[in-house]
Amino acid sequence: MIEEALFDAEEKMEKAVSVAKDDLGTIRTGRANPGMFARVVVDYYGSPTPVTQMSSITVPEPRMVVIKPYEAGQLGAIETAIRNSDLGVNPTNNGDILRITIPQLTEERRRELVKQAKGKGEDAKVAIRNVRRKAMDELARIQKDGEAGEDEVGRAEKELDKTTAKYVSQIDELVKHKEAELLEV
């Protein structure tokens, strides 16, 4: 039971780190990156579909993104979705592809994005701490039900604390890396 609770908690913490990594990847830096379009959604035959799933996205130059839809008829819808997104970019429609030049970030916008990155990191840490709390509650229940002794549960709690610290530090590293990437001119 204890191993199962610990394994479950670690799996959920790993998922929280993965989600944080994806969230931080969507924050636009001064460089072109196909991942920045992962959260841009287009209505594709009645169902919301991410641009990344309905087009080929390439980065021919450090500040240029080229989007070529798999279906030419969707070009206008993709262009509109990108214009309406919070990315702050302006696509140029060349008939069969979209060219997007990534503008240089202002110092103020960089600071804003760093705050946003820190906020996403904090959300991930809260998620990890919530997983820890639920696992601690589960360990307390296991001990109360007499399924494990006090010593075993104590060791498991220490193990859980180490695991929590490991994943929180991973989040800190991700945020620090993103911050450095954003502040790099």
UniProtKB/Swiss-Prot annotation:
One annotated GO biological process: translational termination
SUPFAM superfamilies (UniProt xref): Ribosome recycling factor, RRF
Gene3D superfamilies: 3.30.1360.40, Ribosome-recycling factor
MF terms (GO), sorted A to Z: ribosomal large subunit binding
UniProt keywords, alphabetically: Cytoplasm, Protein biosynthesis
Signal sequence segment: none
Predominant location category: cytoplasm
Entries under Pfam families matching the protein: RRF (PF01765)
Subcellular location: Cytoplasm
Disulfide bond entries: none
Gene Ontology CC: one annotated term: cytoplasm
InterPro entries to which the protein is assigned, alphabetical: Ribosome_recyc_fac, Ribosome_recyc_fac_dom, RRF_sf
PANTHER family membership: MITOCHONDRIAL RIBOSOME RECYCLING FACTOR PSEUDO 1 (PTHR20982:SF3), RIBOSOME RECYCLING FACTOR (PTHR20982)
NCBIfam families, alphabetized: frr
Function: Responsible for the release of ribosomes from messenger RNA at the termination of protein biosynthesis. May increase the efficiency of translation by recycling ribosomes from one round of translation to another.
Homology family: Belongs to the RRF family.
Designated name of the protein: Ribosome-recycling factor
Organism: Nocardia farcinica (strain IFM 10152)
